Every structure is written in C-alpha cells, then in structure tokens.
C-alpha cells in the first residue's frame, strides 16, 4: 500500500505506483490518499492516471497540524484493518507520512520510507518536516535513501545498513517522464502555453534572449517577517532588472498571500515585469520551470528538480536537508535575508561564468531509475 496526501508526495510517489502496477504477478498495488492538499493532489492523480483505492478526504477549512494528524491516524486505522497490506510505503516528511507510518506501526505492519535519511539536524527548521521525517525514520523497516549521504545519516542513527537502499530520488523519475511527454507532443506544448496564459503569464514574452526568474514560496517557518523580507527583495529586483520577467505562482495559503499584498499592494494584475499567477499543476509548472533562467524558492523538491533541467536554484531558507545539492554547486542558500537574495540573483543575472558554474553542475539526485530499484528490493524480500 502506498499512502500520500500532498502534491509533492504525489509527484514523487506517482512513478512508483506506476512501476508497481507493471508487476501484477508480484504485487497487488493499493493506493490510499489522505487529501492533505486536495485540489493540487487531484491534479497530479489525473496527470499520472492514478485512481486511489482509498481516499480519506481529510481537508477541512481552518484545520491545523493537530487536526491533520488525528484525521490521518484514525482514517488509516480503518483502511489498514480492511486492506491488510504486507507493507505500507510513505514518502518524505509530511504529516500524512508520519501519521500513516504510526498507524501502520500500531498494527505491526512494516513501513517503507521513500526519501529516507534527509536531515538538517534542527527540529524547527524546516518545521514540522524535520521532526516528521525523524519520527518516520524510527518507525520504518525499509529505508529508501536518495543519496549516499542520506544513508550515512541513517547509519549514524543506528539504522541497520541491511534495511537501507540508495535509490536516487523518485522525483527525477517523475520529472523525466513529464519532460519527455512535453517535448514529444506539440499539441500538449501548445495546450500548456494556453494554461500559462489563462493563469496570468504569456510565455511568448520569452523571445530574443529575454530571461525569467521563477519564484515559489510557502514554508511555514518563513511566515511573517521572513515573507516580508523575501517579497521586498523581489520587488526591488524587478525594478533593478526591468528587462527580466519575475513569475510567482502563488500558494493558496493566506499566510503566503497576505505579505505579498502588503509589499506589492492590493492590485497584483499590472506590475510591469512582475507576474503573480495562480498555482500551477505539476505539468504546467515543469513547463514553466524548463523555460526559466533562475529558480528562487523555499521548496525542498525543487532543489532536486530544477538542477535536473540545468537551472540554478537559490533557496530562501536558512538550512537545507539536501546538502548534496550545496556540495554539488547546484543550489545556494540565501535565507530570507534581503541583501543575500538581491546579491545572489544579481550575480546570476550579471555574471555568465557564475551562472554557467551552477547551471552546468551535475545533479546529485539520480538517473531516473529509482522506482525500479525500490520495486526490485521489495520483490526480493517477499
């Protein structure tokens, strides 16, 4: 059984679902979604043509982490009793993953942790994700680490090496499938151009070398002053580089939208080279990311995806659980510090050699074959 509930989880678990479904003689594949990110989750399910066997549909207006944890835990109790899976696979660091792993543990069902071993060693950064993944790691029977460093983190916590498989990251599997789909389908390319236009950005502006800075931001630890600093830096960059487009697909969370309006004003529809657009489904986001020059983000997954497309990533967080990307030179930490954000974006836009060093660095997160390795590992342990 594969359990997930947010869009990032769905993106990384979808190619694994499809890989298991290729082997019906060896596996009965059961999919349970929690609906922690309802609308954005459904978009990914549609893209990868996945129909869940169970849907907890936990999303409620005004819910907090207590509500999510309780609803997933109780909902999974009943699902696990009915389905009686041999193993439960969860992904990463979400509240869905931790609560589902705990529910499986309560019924003594083995847990497999996809993207295991990521650590910042600071339980409040990112919050609550760092503690979520540490708890899930303690419960897991099988640990699928994306990199050797992730494996080393687990071994330092006395996790048995026999339970760990270094796989690469399944997000690269998903990314390669989607990019291949876009590049080989002219009709789809045109359709995605239309999706972007309806969302608020015309990709036909990107002619004659015009550059695009793609921005995403949604992390809880940045709410408040952090987002104000980020938005102020972005606003000043749009003025410094009027010939560059800045595009920000806004997260639905009001804690994200409020500081944007505080810095940029109430009307976001006519800001010159600054484009605030509606959230994008995964396919459209990859399409836009492929056309970007730089990615400015506080996301975890984008630190893995964007370098796979040769895009430098500036991370608006103080820590990252992906130090392999820092070591490889594909990402740089800028935090929510105004001066760092402005100076690093400026350096990438002004210095070709600096830009090339980041964009041409080798992505440390795998070759797109992670899902096959996970399926083979579990097949050998039946």
Identify the meaning behind each predicted range.
Residues 1-248, 254-382:
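Nucleotide-activated sugar donor-binding and catalytic core shared by glycosyltransferases
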């Amino acid at each position: 059984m594969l359990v997930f509930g947010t869009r990032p989880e769905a993106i990384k678990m979808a190619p694994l679902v499809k890989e298991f479904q290729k082997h019906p003689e060896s596996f009965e594949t059961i999919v349970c979604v929690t609906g922690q990110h309802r609308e954005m989750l459904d978009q990914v399910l549609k893209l990868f043509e996945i129909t869940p066997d169970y849907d907890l549909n936990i999303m409620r207006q005004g819910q907090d982490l207590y509500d999510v944890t309780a609803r997933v835990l109780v909902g999974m109790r009943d699902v696990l009793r009915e389905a009686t899976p041999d193993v439960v696979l969860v992904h990463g660091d979400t509240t869905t993953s931790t609560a589902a792993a705990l529910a499986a543990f309560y019924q003594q069902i083995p847990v497999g942790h996809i993207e295991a071993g990521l650590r910042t060693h600071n339980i409040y950064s990112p919050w609550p994700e760092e503690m979520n993944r540490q708890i899930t790691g303690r419960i897991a029977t099988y640990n699928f680490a994306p990199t050797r460093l992730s494996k080393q983190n687990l071994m330092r916590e006395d996790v048995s090496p026999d339970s760990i498989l270094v796989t690469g990251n399944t997000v690269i599997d998903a990314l390669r499938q989607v990019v291949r789909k876009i590049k080989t389908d002219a009709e789809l390319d045109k359709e995605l151009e239309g999706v972007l236009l309806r969302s608020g950005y015309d990709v036909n502006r990107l002619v004659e070398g015009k550059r695009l800075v793609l921005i995403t931001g949604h992390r809880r630890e940045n709410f408040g002053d952090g987002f104000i600093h980020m938005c102020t830096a972005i606003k000043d960059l749009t003025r410094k580089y009027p010939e560059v487009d800045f595009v920000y697909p806004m997260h639905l969370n009001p804690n994200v939208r409020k500081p944007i309006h505080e810095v940029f004003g109430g009307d976001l529809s006519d800001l010159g080279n600054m484009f605030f657009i509606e959230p994008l489904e995964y396919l459209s986001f990859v399409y836009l990311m492929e056309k970007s020059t730089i990615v400015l983000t506080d996301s975890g997954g984008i630190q893995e995806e964007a370098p796979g497309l040769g895009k430098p990533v500036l991370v608006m967080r103080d820590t990252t659980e992906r130090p392999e990307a820092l070591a490889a030179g594909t990402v740089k930490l800028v935090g929510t510090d105004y001066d760092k954000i402005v100076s690093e974006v400026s350096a990438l836009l002004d210095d070709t050699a600096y830009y090339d060093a980041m964009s041409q660095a080798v992505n440390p997160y795998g070759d797109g074959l992670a899902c096959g390795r996970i399926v083979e590992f579990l097949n050998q342990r039946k």
